[in-house]
Every structure is written in structure tokens, then in C-alpha cells.
């Protein structure tokens, strides 16, 4: 399971010209599901995302996690993160989770974060989305479990 996280000062996701999810300070999470992923991996990755210290403390060091910084999550499904780009000029998605598996784990990730008290907005699974963000830093990390 893969989460490309970006520290943002604001982010939003639109579907058909309508904003369906938006946050101010927080993390934009592009979430990719691979074939071997399961609920245990989802919980491990969600915990890591929420606990990862990417926000600056009073000394300017990345020492605060999402909760400590008072941030929110915007979670967007992104199957292309599971692409194999090692050969040729066209990505292969054979390692990506099935649509049913990915939706189940995406929904579980969102609900897990909400259950931990994190304000969580979402995109729309499998929709054609327009994601806008202001990357703060820029700070971007690729987390995998």
C-alpha cells in the first residue's frame, strides 16, 4: 500500500466542476492499493500517515505530526501509484489492486482516520477528479508498507 503525502496549506478535489472535498492546513494523501494489500497493511499505513512528523515546531524543525499541528487530511484514490515503470515507455498496472479490493481498503483507510479523530475529506473513488493544492515547503513523502 502506498501513500504519497504532501504537506499543504490548502487542497481541494473537484468532480464535474463541483468541489467535493477541501482542507486548509494538513496533508493531501494520494492513496494507492497493490494486489497484496490487506486491512493490516491499511492500518499500519494510516497510522504512519497520521503519526509522521512533517510539520514544523517552534524551532522550524519537522517535529510535529498531523494532530499536533492541528491539520486535516484530504484522501484521494490514486491507482497509478502502483504502476511498474521499470521497463518500456508505458506503465504496467498489473501490480495494482483490483477495483473492489482498492475501494474496500480506500474506504477503510478513510474510516480508520476518522475514527482516530482526524478531520478527513475525500475525493470520489474511481472518478475523474481535478485536484488542486498549495504544497507547503514543498514537502512530499512517499510512504509504503
Swiss-Prot record:
Span(s) of short sequence motif Gly-cisPro motif, important for rejection of L-amino acids: 137-138
Keyword Transcription regulation recorded: no
InterPro entries: Daa-tRNA_deacyls_DTD, DTD-like_sf
Subcellular location: Cytoplasm
Superkingdom of origin organism: Bacteria
Primary localization class, coarse: cytoplasm
BP GO annotations: D-amino acid catabolic process
Keywords: Cytoplasm, Hydrolase, RNA-binding, tRNA-binding
The enzyme's E.C. designation: 3.1.1.96
EC top class named in words: hydrolase
GO cellular component, one term: cytoplasm
Molecular-function annotations in GO: D-tyrosyl-tRNA(Tyr) deacylase activity; Gly-tRNA(Ala) deacylase activity; Ser(Gly)-tRNA(Ala) hydrolase activity; tRNA binding
Catalytic activity: glycyl-tRNA(Ala) + H2O = tRNA(Ala) + glycine + H(+); a D-aminoacyl-tRNA + H2O = a tRNA + a D-alpha-amino acid + H(+)
Notes concerning its domains: A Gly-cisPro motif from one monomer fits into the active site of the other monomer to allow specific chiral rejection of L-amino acids.
Subunit structure: Homodimer.
Family according to the record: Belongs to the DTD family.
The protein's role, per its UniProt record: An aminoacyl-tRNA editing enzyme that deacylates mischarged D-aminoacyl-tRNAs. Also deacylates mischarged glycyl-tRNA(Ala), protecting cells against glycine mischarging by AlaRS. Acts via tRNA-based rather than protein-based catalysis; rejects L-amino acids rather than detecting D-amino acids in the active site. By recycling D-aminoacyl-tRNA to D-amino acids and free tRNA molecules, this enzyme counteracts the toxicity associated with the formation of D-aminoacyl-tRNA entities in vivo and helps enforce protein L-homochirality.
The name this protein goes by in its record: D-aminoacyl-tRNA deacylase
Organism: Shewanella woodyi (strain ATCC 51908 / MS32)
Amino acid at each position: 500500500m502506498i501513500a504519497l503525502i504532501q504537506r499543504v496549506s490548502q487542497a481541494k478535489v473537484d468532480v464535474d466542476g463541483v468541489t467535493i472535498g477541501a482542507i486548509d492546513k494538513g496533508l493531501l494523501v494520494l492513496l494507492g492499493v497493490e494486489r497484496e494489500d490487506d486491512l493490516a497493511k491499511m492500518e499500519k499505513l494510516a497510522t504512519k500517515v497520521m503519526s509522521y512528523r512533517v510539520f514544523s515546531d517552534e524551532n522550524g524543525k519537522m517535529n510535529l505530526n498531523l494532530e499536533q499541528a492541528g491539520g486535516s487530511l484530504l484522501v484521494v484514490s490514486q491507482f497509478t501509484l502502483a504502476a511498474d515503470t521499470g521497463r518500456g515507455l508505458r506503465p504496467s498496472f498489473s501490480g495494482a489492486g483490483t477495483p473492489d479490493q482498492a475501494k474496500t481498503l480506500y474506504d477503510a483507510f478513510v474510516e480508520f482516520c476518522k475514527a482516530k479523530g482526524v478531520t478527513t475529506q475525500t475525493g470520489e473513488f474511481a472518478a475523474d477528479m481535478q485536484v488542486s493544492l498549495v504544497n507547503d515547503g514543498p514537502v512530499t513523502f512517499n510512504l509504503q508498507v
